[in-house]
Curated annotation (Swiss-Prot):
The lineage of its organism: Bacteria, Bacillati, Bacillota, Bacilli, Bacillales. SUPFAM superfamilies: Pectin lyase-like (SSF51126). InterPro entries: Pectate_lyase_PlyH/PlyE-like (IPR004898), Pectin_lyas_fold (IPR012334), Pectin_lyase_fold/virulence (IPR011050). Pathway: Glycan metabolism; pectin degradation; 2-dehydro-3-deoxy-D-gluconate from pectin: step 2/5. This is Pectate lyase C. Binds 1 Ca(2+) ion per subunit. The keyword Metal-binding applies. It catalyses: Eliminative cleavage of (1->4)-alpha-D-galacturonan to give oligosaccharides with 4-deoxy-alpha-D-galact-4-enuronosyl groups at their non-reducing ends; Eliminative cleavage of (1->4)-alpha-D-galacturonan methyl ester to give oligosaccharides with 4-deoxy-6-O-methyl-alpha-D-galact-4-enuronosyl groups at their non-reducing ends. Its main location: secreted.
Amino acid sequence: MKRLAGTVILSGLLVCGFGQALPEKALAAEVVHKTIVVEKGQTYDGKGKRLIAGPELGDGSQREDQKPIFKVEDGATLKNVVLGAPAADGVHTYGNASINNVVWEDVGEDALTVKSEGSVTINGGSARLAADKIFQINKASTFTVKNFTADQGGKFIRQLGGSTFKAVVNIDNCTITNMKEAIFRTDSSTSSVTMTNTRYSKVGQKWIGVKHATERNNHEF
């Protein structure tokens, strides 16, 4: 582990003082040919490992038939991983899940998709270069993102188009830049978003379809 001017370099993850992580480009990639399952209640600690998807999983485009690099089951934790390009369909969560210091260098179809009901918390990490959305919510859930950096995407968070289930979205201490459409887009009148202590710039309309938004101590720059 190395320290540099307020940062910590840990096996390929450059983690700044706010817990946000950026990748070290020099780290060699390991090719994943079959989805890695983080089983119920278990923790997968990549220790800074950099992974890319093999052709069996997908090419990282917007094709809907791609498979994830990680499947995170109920009560499981994924941490300290860098996902390079191609990232196929990123990470799928099933139930309650913790995602800590995961970096998406070049978002594939999506960075992360909520596939079943639960509470998902993303703490630390970063994502960039998403052709469409970064995070996709497909089931009723509480979805929390904190200490995260996102740059260049269509939407930071998108609830499944046309769905009416309730998603409770919390965004705290994030930096969000260069979104073409919005920070959060939903078609559900029952979903809500709370954003606090967050810096943002060039994010389109900020909210699309959101009926319940709470904002505190944010800064547009």
